[in-house]
């Protein structure tokens, strides 16, 4: 079903530091947040699917249950549901788990400063080809502009990264500027599920070691509905400013109470050096910011 998009007036931008987040040396990520294994997303079969532009690709649970992943949509342009989220973005935007970059490219086309991050080299390369800017890193790695981003996106199920919504919300709070906006896509039922899954393309044997040599290839993941996300968010000082459904996809916009203090582990601004120029520079290192042409 398709829901009606609520009035955007509830998303009046809060006063923010207007400096762009790319003017600060990234500091270490929060030491209390576990860093999940990112290897499965950086190699086959995810990379194969992105190169081909289509699936099949699934998250396979240990009991054999399959969650189809919409690779074709990810590799296409931003659709109406995506645009319903992008229209709400404020200030510079960080897209966590940007995949092949459709959202970053659309934001750039609309004049937003936007950066995608993804652990997949193939995803980052695809983002660059579409005209977006991307960095090959995990959300739990040190990132440029921590505490400066106007909006953080967790779309396409990325609220499930690491299998720990509470920890991911803590990390997101570190990345956002005071009063910044988190836009997350949830799942339609009231689900609060934490599982171990592996990537599966329907062709390779679902059991045994994966092709990376990283054990059995399973990693933690979460699937949560809007009520569950709000339950996780409330103790951390987040409050909902918008909820809507577009083309059957539910979204939530959250803002964190400015009075809730986030402990920053970023380098001292006064002693930091620029890691990205006013236009994201072209780099080729897997640890460096990357920009499209």
What are these regions (language model features)?
Residues 166-178:
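A short glycine-rich, Lys/Arg-flanked "PGG" loop and its adjoining helix->strand segment in the class I
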Residues 120:
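Conserved SAM/SAH-binding beta-strand->alpha-helix loop
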Residues 2-24, 30-88:
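S-adenosyl-L-methionine
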Residues 140-151:
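A short acidic, Gly/Pro-enriched loop at the edge of an enzyme's catalytic core
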Residues 149-166:
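A short SAM/SAH-binding and catalytic strip from SAM-dependent methyltransferases
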Residues 179-187:
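Conserved beta-strand signature within the Rossmann-like core of class I S-adenosyl-L-methionine
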Residues 219-243:
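Short alpha-helix
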Residues 131-141:
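Conserved SAM-binding strand-loop segment of SAM-dependent methyltransferases
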């Amino acid at each position: 079903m398709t829901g009606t998009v609520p009035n955007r007036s509830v998303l009046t931008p809060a006063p923010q530091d207007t400096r762009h987040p790319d003017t600060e040396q990234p500091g270490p990520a929060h030491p209390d947040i576990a860093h999940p294994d990112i290897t499965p997303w950086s190699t086959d079969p995810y990379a194969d699917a992105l190169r081909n532009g289509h699936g099949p690709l699934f998250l396979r649970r240990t009991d054999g249950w399959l969650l189809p992943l919409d690779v074709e949509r990810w590799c296409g342009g931003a659709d109406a549901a995506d645009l319903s989220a992008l229209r709400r973005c404020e200030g510079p935007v960080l897209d966590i788990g940007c995949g092949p970059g459709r959202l970053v490219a659309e934001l750039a086309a609309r004049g937003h400063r936007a950066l995608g991050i993804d652990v997949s080299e193939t995803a980052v390369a695809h983002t660059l080809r579409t005209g977006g800017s991307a960095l090959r890193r995990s959300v739990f790695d040190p990132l440029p502009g921590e505490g400066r981003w106007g909006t953080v996106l967790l779309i396409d199920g990325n609220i499930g990264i690491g299998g720990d919504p509470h920890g991911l919300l803590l990390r997101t709070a570190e990345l956002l500027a005071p009063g910044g906006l988190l836009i997350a896509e949830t799942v339609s039922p009231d689900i609060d599920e934490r599982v171990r899954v592996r990537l599966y393309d329907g062709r390779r044997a679902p059991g045994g070691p994966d092709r990376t040599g990283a054990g059995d290839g399973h990693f933690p993941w979460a699937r949560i509905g809007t009520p569950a996300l709000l339950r996780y968010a409330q103790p951390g000082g987040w409050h909902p400013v918008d909820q809507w459904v577009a083309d059957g996809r539910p979204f939530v916009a959250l803002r964190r109470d400015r009075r809730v203090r986030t402990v920053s582990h970023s380098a001292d601004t006064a002693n930091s050096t620029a890691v990205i120029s006013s236009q994201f520079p072209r780099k080729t290192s897997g640890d460096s910011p990357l920009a499209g042409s």
